[in-house]
Amino acid sequence: MNDFATMDDIQTLWRELKPEEMSRAKELLTVVSESLRYEAEKVGRNLDQMISNSESLKNVAKSVTVDVVARTLMTSTDTEPMTQ
């Protein structure tokens, strides 16, 4: 199955990626797309079929995918977690 967004979508809708972000972003596109499919399946929906019937939903899925990937990339993974 195809991802709901592409690397070009990330760079167009968010920002140019740094070289060290490229491979992580590519993997995240698949993870996020599959997560959205899973959530739809949990409520008895086939997201790919729904998207094939609606250009608007296709764009929403793209937007959500880019947003989640961008937020994940902005989250630091090389520092200690904060504690109270």
PLM regions: where:
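Divalent metal-cofactor coordination and adjacent catalytic microenvironments
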Residues: 1-84
